[in-house]
Structure formats: C-alpha cells, structure tokens
Regions:
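Autoprocessing Asn-cyclization modules and mimics
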Residues: 1-56
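Extracellular structured ligand-interaction cores
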Residues: 4, 20, 37, 100-112, ...
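Short, well-ordered junction/capping motifs at the entry into regular secondary structure
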Residues: 8-10, 75-109, 163
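Extended Gly/Ser/Thr-rich low-complexity repeat segments
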Residues: 15-30, 61-85
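Short acidic-hydrophobic catalytic motif
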Residues: 27, 41-42, 81-85, 101-102, ...
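An acidic- and aromatic-residue-enriched active-site/binding cleft used to recognize and process polar
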Residues: 28, 60, 108-111, 115-120
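C-terminal, surface-exposed recognition/capping segments
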Residues: 112-120, 139-235
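A short, polar/charged loop-to-alpha-helix boundary motif
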Residues: 122-133
Length: 235
C-alpha cells in the first residue's frame, strides 16, 4: 500500500488518459471507494516498474494498493468554452474521448445521465409539469398533467415516440424495435416501478447512448455516480 496522488498502471492502459480528464479510483470498475471525480494532472513513465506509467491526480492523497482500479468517470464541464462554433468538438481531439457541443450545449449526451425534472411516471403513464416552482416527486395531479399516451412496456431501441399536442417536447418511446442503425438508434429502458426520467446516457453507455436515449426505470430515490442534472437557467 502507498499513500499519494498517483496510481501506477500498465502503459497501454495509462496512455488512454489525458491531462484534465475526470477519473475515479476504487476497488473495481465503477467503484469510487478511494477517489471520486478527480482530475488527471500529469502522466509520466514509472521509474520503478517496466512498461508502466504513473497517473497523477488532484485532491487529497489516496491509499493505493495493487488491486486499486483507475477508470474514466464523468468529465468536468468547460472543455468547449473557448470554441467559437455552436457545434463540434475540441480542436485536435479525434480519439472519441473529447467533449462535444451541439447548439452551444456541451456534452448533450453520453457523459452523464441527465435527470429530467417535471416528468413523473406511474406504471408507464407520464405526468408532466411545466411550472418549475411546482416540481415534486411522486405527484400526479394539480400542476402535473397526464400525458396523452402510455409509454412502451418493452425496452429496446426506439422505433416510435408518442405525441401529445399539448406536450410535444416530452418524446417518450411508445414502440421499440429499432436498432443501433435504424429508426432513432437510441435505447429506451423501462420498468413498472420507474418513477423518473433520465436522458442521454453516460460514459459507459457506448452505442446505445444518444440524444433520445431515455431511462424510465429508476425510482425517485435512486442516486449514483452517473446521474446528474443540467441547469436550465442562470441568474
């Protein structure tokens, strides 16, 4: 065991990381038991182990062991802030690991699941609220209105979205049967006990992630490293 601000890993694995990248360290993949949401500050060849590199990170020192696992977690925001274009990716980043921007929105999908406030579910039926002051979990009346269709009870790639002329922006899957190359090419998760909506997927979602990727299978009390939110306004 060694306490410090670096972890030594195989060179081919360590070279996947970059300065400024968000990382976590734990007892296994997706574990943050040792360090959560740190940033890589330096990567250099190990002087102690052949064909290995030391990946340095910010924050408090960590007790590293031979079984500790380094992995890429949610990426910090701001990578595209200097871009002049509303769309694209950071110049020179072509390895599939860079932040992207669409209509000025950074990492619209694929970095973290983004919680959609104002959309509650009860047995596949969605209830929608457009009054931010009235947002609340497990509310299906009052400021929350019943959407004019029931979501699909089968998960899979999205083939069709429901349409309610009162709330056209909701776009919840009603028919699955697409694929990663046909129809909307994004996935839909569901469960009878699902109560909230998360969108976009996260860093480990792979090909199923996308702007229309919806998770409607979580309860309102669920939390995890890969679920967050996005501010809709700034004062």
């Amino acid at each position: 065991e060694r306490t410090g601000n670096y972890i030594t890993v195989a060179k081919d694995y360590g070279n996947r990381f970059a300065i400024g990248q968000g990382i976590s360290i734990g007892a296994g993949l997706w574990s943050q038991s040792l360090a959560a949401d740190r940033r890589v500050t330096k990567i250099e060849d190990s002087t102690e182990i052949d064909n290995a590199v030391c990946v340095y990170f910010d924050g408090d020192p960590v007790a590293i062991t031979t079984t500790s696992v380094l992995w890429s977690s949610l990426q910090p925001t701001g990578a595209t802030i200097e871009m002049a274009s509303p769309n694209g990716r950071v110049e020179g980043k072509t390895n599939g690991m860079s932040a992207i921007r669409f209509l000025w929105i950074e990492d619209w999908y694929g970095n973290m699941w983004q919680f959609r406030d104002g959309d509650n579910i009860q047995s596949w039926q969605h209830y929608y609220c457009n009054d931010r002051s009235a947002y609340a979990d497990k509310v299906y009346s009052g400021s929350y209105f019943k959407v004019g269709y029931v979501a699909s009870k089968t998960e899979g790639y999205v083939k069709e979205f429901g349409y309610d002329p009162e709330w056209p922006e909701i776009e919840i899957c009603t028919v699955t049967g697409g694929s990663s190359a046909t129809y909307f090419c994004d996935y839909y998760y569901q469960a009878e006990g699902g109560e909230v909506v998360v969108s976009g997927g996260n860093v480990d979602s792979g090909a199923v992630a996308g702007p229309f990727f919806r998770g409607c299978n979580y309860g309102s009390g669920f939390s995890s490293w890969h679920i967050g939110g996005r501010p809709q306004a700034r004062k």
